[in-house]
Amino acid sequence: MNNIVLILKMISKHYKQGNTIVRVLDGLNLTANEGELIAIIGSSGSGKSTLLHIAGLLDKPTNGQVIIPNIKYKKYHLIRLYYLGFIYQQHHLLKDFTALENVIIPRLIRGLDQKEAIKDATKILDDLGLEKKLYNMPGELSGGEQQRVAIARSLINKPRIILADEPTGNLDPNTTNEVFNLFLKVARKQNTTVIMVTHNHELAHKMDKLYNLKHGLLNIA
């Protein structure tokens, strides 16, 4: 049996709009195992991004628990730095840094050896088909290449969990499939758990598990 890396236990998130309580998440449960690829679909406004923010310790639930077993740190910013990786629809690359420099930044923030960081970043970028683009600036890269750099950056610290919010949402269909397949290849190679929210059902069906978020709860799709 795989090791459990994340438990969301009876998660609720409520907002007040005027005199009305909006129940975005309402007693939601999820268990993610090591190396598992999980997709979450749902209509716009169903709470998919809210769910990722709570799972990534970027937001607090109204009720419920987020449990990340067997971790050394208790402070949220350290848990995010050492155990979690994030990919968004926008790549958020630093425009004045090369592809390679963008990728090694999370390693340097942790105070790790720069030579080792460059070696590992070069390997990941190579796995993502960017071996000839290491020293290109973001503005010299295509949209798909920029997103691959962002993916490499999320993987450089070998996180237990990647939280991906529409990671290919800005790409054309052909580029979407190419980038996504490379992403899954590297994630599987690292045995990294991926929790992805998406509107793209074709991509969602490439994952190990598929859930539909509806009325604040997750159901197997």
Curated annotation (Swiss-Prot):
Record GO terms (molecular function): ATP binding; ATP hydrolysis activity
UniProt binding sites for ATP: 42-49
Membrane topology (UniProt): Peripheral membrane protein
Chain segments annotated as coiled-coil in the UniProt record: none
Keywords recorded for this protein, A-Z: ATP-binding, Cell inner membrane, Cell membrane, Membrane, Nucleotide-binding, Translocase, Transport
Entry keyword annotation includes Nucleotide-binding: yes
Quaternary structure note: The complex is composed of two ATP-binding proteins (LolD) and two transmembrane proteins (LolC and LolE).
Protein name: Lipoprotein-releasing system ATP-binding protein LolD
Name of the encoding gene: lolD
Annotated ABC transporter domain residues: 8-220
GO CC annotations on file: plasma membrane
Signal peptide (residue range): none
